[in-house]
A protein has these predicted regions:
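C-terminal motif of bacterial Sec signal peptides marking the signal peptidase cleavage site
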Residues: 18-22
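Short, low-complexity, disordered segments immediately C-terminal to signal peptides
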Residues: 23-43
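Short, polar/charged alpha-helical segment
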Residues: 38-44, 48, 52-73
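Extracytoplasmic ligand-binding site segments that recognize negatively charged/polar headgroups
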Residues: 48-60, 79-83, 95-235
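A ligand-binding cleft/hinge motif common to bilobed small-molecule-binding domains
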Residues: 105-111, 232, 237-255
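Periplasmic-binding protein-like
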Residues: 144, 174-183, 209-214, 220, 252-276, 290-313, ...
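A bilobed periplasmic-binding-protein/Venus flytrap-type ligand-binding module shared by bacterial periplasmic
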Residues: 147-154, 192-197, 268-281, 291, ...
Length: 354
């Protein structure tokens, strides 16, 4: 991974560009070709993007910067991935949203249900093939990865675990947690990551289920909902979760060490789509172009989500990702991961939860 050394100044930059463009417009001959900002101003808005809560993934700053650059209003939306899919289905006859954002598995669902349409924004050629739909109906905008979030204060003199097998050691009895895979998408990603790291594949979840059985015997905690506060407060000293949640806690001064397991992790991509029959389709396209821009990618990185494109970010943010990130973090066939999920969860229910 290349590390670029430029401060994150996207909001200031785009605002300045917009201001300069406005000043230039006052002195430009009427016959001159309109600027990109002027062209954007002719696009009818607003753009409604489902699942863009202000405090998540730095969406608040991204939406604000997009409006500053284009003049197109872009209100935030509080839905999560599942709620977004449900709303798109309910509104299919008269769509309300123009774009939608969700975990990659939901991208497959949206495509399969005919809820989205093809659009390939500027910069999509830099998105890895495994992280975009071949027909252009969704593409990744950034990703997280599975990691061990370790509260080092609560760990005391115990060594920090670095592999999946380490977590099954009796010295960590009752100290490890991960979200219930039958209830949470991140939990299923944890199980899949462990399975792949321990020699399994998407056709064989045996190693992952054996690991889960050992974890159960070692007193693992399986919350149903987000448990970041539990590791922050020391209730769960070692939480297996999304890396960006840990980096955020560390940046806030909490005693959290983020460990990418030496034997392998798993990518957690987040993708976007243009909604089928979007009421403000051109505004939606402009927004999708923007989320892959250097400015937006750098803004997403402020929440410790790894940009999907190789862009310049604050060096203090870039340095939290290990140099061997790309080799540690597996990118499986997410379509197959979705297809086998029901059967794997049935086995987990029977063999682990019993």
């Amino acid at each position: 991974m290349r590390t670029h050394l430029r401060a994150l100044t996207a909001v200031t930059t785009v605002t300045a560009v917009a201001a300069l463009a406005a000043c230039s417009a006052e002195t430009t001959d009427d016959a001159a070709e309109p600027s990109q900002d002027s062209a954007a101003a002719t696009i009818e808005g607003p753009v409604i993007s489902y699942n863009s809560p202000t405090e998540w993934a730095n969406w608040g700053a991204v939406l604000e910067a997009f409006t500053a650059e284009t003049g197109i209003e872009a209100p935030s939306d509080p839905k999560n991935s599942g709620q977004s899919i449900a709303a798109l289905e309910a509104e299919a006859a008269a769509p309300v949203a123009d774009t939608a954002y969700y975990g990659v598995v939901f991208g497959y669902q949206a495509s399969d249900k005919g809820l989205v349409q093809a659009y390939e924004p500027e910069g999509v050629d830099e998105v890895p093939d495994a992280l975009k739909d071949p027909d252009g109906e969704w593409f990744a905008v950034h990703q997280g990865a599975i990691a061990f979030l370790v509260n080092t204060d609560e760990l005391g003199d115990l060594p920090v675990p670095t592999t999946w097998e380490d977590l099954t050691d009796p010295m960590y009895e009752g100290m490890v947690g991960y979200l219930d895979p039958t209830q949470a998408a991140v939990g299923y990603s944890v199980l899949t990551a462990a399975n792949l790291a321990l020699g399994g594949d998407l056709d064989d979840f045996g190693p992952g289920l054996e690991w889960a059985a050992k974890m159960k015997a070692n007193g693992v905690v399986n919350p149903v909902q987000t448990a970041t506060a539990s590791v922050q407060q020391g209730e769960i000293p070692i939480l297996i979760d999304a890396d960006f949640n840990g980096h955020t806690l560390t940046a806030a001064g909490d005693p959290i060490e983020v460990v990418y397991p030496e034997d392998g992790s798993l990518a957690i991509p987040y993708v976007m789509s243009l909604v089928a029959d979007a009421p403000h389709e051109e505004a939606g396209k402009a927004f999708l172009d923007y989320v892959l821009s250097d400015e937006a990618q750098a803004l997403f990185a402020e929440s410790y989500l790894k940009p999907i494109r190789d862009v310049e970010v604050d060096p203090q943010i870039a340095e939290v990702f290990p140099d061997d990130y790309d080799s540690l973090v597996a990118t499986p066939d997410f379509a197959q991961m979705q297809q086998v999920q029901e059967d794997v969860m049935a086995r987990y229910q029977a063999e682990i939860l019993g």
